[in-house]
Amino acid sequence: MTTPDAEDASPSPEYRSDQDDDMAAEQTTDRQSGDASPTQKPANGKPNAKDPLRPRRKKARRACFACQRAHLTCGDERPCGRCIKRGLQDHCMDGVRKKAKYLHDAPDGSLMPGVGGHYPYMNGNRPTPLPAQDTHTVSVSPQSNMYNQAQPPAAFYPPNSIPGQLPVTQDTRAFSNQQSPISPPFTQAHHASVQNAGAPSTMSQGQQGMQQFGPLFDPSDPALFNFDISSLNFGNHYGALEFGMLGHMSSGAVETPHDNNLMNNMSGSVNMYNQQVPSGYPDQNNAAAMAFGPNGLPGSEWQETQSRQGSMHVHTPNNTSGSGSHDHHPHRNDSLNGPHAFAIGQGPATHSTASPASTDASTYEGDNPLSTAAFFANANRPHAQRSPLVSRPQQENRPPTTALQSIHANGIRKRQRDTKSVYQGITKPYDYVKGYHRLYQLIDKKYSRPWVAKAQQYLQNYRPVLLQVREELNRDDLIHQEMGLQRHLMTLQEHFAEVGTPFLICRRSGEIVGINKEFTILTGWKRDVLLGHEPNLNVNLGTNRESSESDTSTQNTTPNLSAQDSEGATPSVNIIELMDARSALEFLQHFSELCYQDPRGYASQRVNMLRYQTKADVDRIHNMKNASSGDAKLDPLVKMEGGAVHQGESAMQRLGAKSGMVDCMIWWHIKRDIFDMPVLVCMSVMPVLDKGLP
């Protein structure tokens, strides 16, 4: 390097600023007076730098590296005049400009002036490979020391290799020459030294798929996120990388790889993934190659880095390796699972379009080692190396993924119901004849003579049809009918339990089979009493019979069955026992209309529900009335704009406390079985709230 002269100017000792007019930075020209001579020179003989008519040199499109550091002007020629003057002509090269954000992944060569339109990898184009770049197949013999089963010979496409003659004898546990994981420049020369090998190299199919993986986060590798950018024709490569990273984070954040015992010991793993050392290198390098991987990492870290890659190899413009995902399960249903977010465009470079259907994400949780959670949570755990050809038969033996399995895998839980008691515990049909006999007895006991005739007329509208259909069914049909009723009841109870309104479910003959807690609070009827588990001690009958009428009637009375008299089980409470006489008669009328005349209809009516009151409850209420003499003060109500409202269970329990009846509105409809026979009555009960408590 020459000694800087007085004409050089630089912020550092090596580069000094130049005061020559042709090499100095452009200055703002000051307006001179009209009588000033344009050719006038100062006393030192140098031209005036502020002269507007002085010759100007053309501004360079890109300065060289030395001039760029010195913040001086430069020329378009290489080497430039300043570097020649200072003896730096051998090192004169274009300076590196700061890339824009959208040019982050563009190679430096594509940003050279005049090269943008002719750069071979712009706009998704692919250059014609040179003769030295042609990939020739090399026969690969099966590997047997790692996998016991034999593998057919396959074609191996060798990557870029270091020039040199390979030895004839190869260690079967080691790789052949492997390309560096770091992306090479686009002008890297390709060598075909593998073609001149004296003997065919041997490697396993699993090692072949894993040797071509690059680093996980190489920013200069276009195949960073499992798709070939040059084949997408986006135009904005940086945007593609951004969306690829977002999809990578969202699609793999919950996946964790399976932990299995397929890993070999550390020494075997390191020996298996080392690159071959050519014959031109000394033998002492073998020790370093055995301890470190191709990218300079220790053997264990190199193995973990490779385990995070997929098992599908994607070609890129720089001949770097990208990782993809093989379809480990041929029966996967993409319509339910769907491809992962960055699966668009995934696949070999031969695909001209980015179709989500052409790619398949990992079916199982552990098959995606690129997941974010798996990468950070299991950074120090060994991962099993999967070979595409060897693990394929094992994975094909897995059961096919059905729609139900896919839904459960995504976290949607299924209701767990114990249906064995329904399908295995029911061995005989329900005796509706006994139920209707008891219904007739309740009607005769509850109603007066004129009302009994009306109730029997309502029953005659539909019961003959039920008896006719019953004669066409055998015992198995009736058992199946009861199973369907109990199974349907199980579903209805789950649905009504999620709604905070009182509900009631009964058979077509009136027996109660299902209630909820809200109905118990509203009416005071306990669940065990309604279902027949406890004796019914209710004395609040709500009858309209006159005291002069006889308790027993010999006209239109169905005799008791002998089996019914001997039966010791307590029957369920009938629905007409929960209503007063007028409300129960109206219910029977609506049921006769909806049973067959309007099978898909519903009914709503206002009823008086009877509260459950035993003899002790009636005596206590009577004593409280006598003691208070009407002077008892009720609890204060919560005041709102619309008046007083009822708050809590205690307010609901006081409804109908004096009269023994709760004013309600009911809405109900009929459920049918496969024989189109009415089997269940589903009823919602809503109390009619007044402004004040009764």
From Swiss-Prot:
<dbReference type="GO" id="GO:0009267">
    <property type="term" value="P:cellular response to starvation"/>
</dbReference>
<feature type="compositionally biased region" description="Low complexity">
    <location>
        <begin position="205"/>
        <end position="214"/>
    </location>
</feature>
<feature type="region of interest" description="Disordered">
    <location>
        <begin position="1"/>
        <end position="57"/>
    </location>
</feature>
<feature type="compositionally biased region" description="Low complexity">
    <location>
        <begin position="349"/>
        <end position="363"/>
    </location>
</feature>
<feature type="compositionally biased region" description="Polar residues">
    <location>
        <begin position="392"/>
        <end position="408"/>
    </location>
</feature>
<dbReference type="GO" id="GO:0008270">
    <property type="term" value="F:zinc ion binding"/>
</dbReference>
<dbReference type="InterPro" id="IPR056751">
    <property type="entry name" value="PAS_13"/>
</dbReference>
<keyword id="KW-0862">Zinc</keyword>
<feature type="region of interest" description="Disordered">
    <location>
        <begin position="384"/>
        <end position="420"/>
    </location>
</feature>
<dbReference type="InterPro" id="IPR036864">
    <property type="entry name" value="Zn2-C6_fun-type_DNA-bd_sf"/>
</dbReference>
<keyword id="KW-0805">Transcription regulation</keyword>
<keyword id="KW-0312">Gluconeogenesis</keyword>
<dbReference type="InterPro" id="IPR050335">
    <property type="entry name" value="ERT1_acuK_gluconeogen_tf"/>
</dbReference>
<dbReference type="InterPro" id="IPR001138">
    <property type="entry name" value="Zn2Cys6_DnaBD"/>
</dbReference>
<dbReference type="Pfam" id="PF24990">
    <property type="entry name" value="PAS_13"/>
</dbReference>
<dbReference type="GO" id="GO:0000981">
    <property type="term" value="F:DNA-binding transcription factor activity, RNA polymerase II-specific"/>
</dbReference>
<comment type="function">
    <text>Transcription factor which regulates nonfermentable carbon utilization. Activator of gluconeogenetic genes.</text>
</comment>
<dbReference type="GO" id="GO:0006094">
    <property type="term" value="P:gluconeogenesis"/>
</dbReference>
<keyword id="KW-0238">DNA-binding</keyword>
<feature type="region of interest" description="Disordered">
    <location>
        <begin position="175"/>
        <end position="216"/>
    </location>
</feature>
<dbReference type="GO" id="GO:0000977">
    <property type="term" value="F:RNA polymerase II transcription regulatory region sequence-specific DNA binding"/>
</dbReference>
<comment type="similarity">
    <text>Belongs to the ERT1/acuK family.</text>
</comment>
<keyword id="KW-0479">Metal-binding</keyword>
<feature type="region of interest" description="Disordered">
    <location>
        <begin position="289"/>
        <end position="369"/>
    </location>
</feature>
<protein>
    <recommendedName>
        <fullName>Transcription activator of gluconeogenesis PTRG_06536</fullName>
    </recommendedName>
</protein>
<keyword id="KW-0804">Transcription</keyword>
<keyword id="KW-0010">Activator</keyword>
<dbReference type="GO" id="GO:0005634">
    <property type="term" value="C:nucleus"/>
</dbReference>
<feature type="compositionally biased region" description="Polar residues">
    <location>
        <begin position="193"/>
        <end position="204"/>
    </location>
</feature>
<feature type="compositionally biased region" description="Polar residues">
    <location>
        <begin position="302"/>
        <end position="324"/>
    </location>
</feature>
<feature type="domain" description="PAS">
    <location>
        <begin position="485"/>
        <end position="559"/>
    </location>
</feature>
<feature type="region of interest" description="Disordered">
    <location>
        <begin position="539"/>
        <end position="569"/>
    </location>
</feature>
<feature type="DNA-binding region" description="Zn(2)-C6 fungal-type">
    <location>
        <begin position="64"/>
        <end position="92"/>
    </location>
</feature>
<keyword id="KW-0539">Nucleus</keyword>
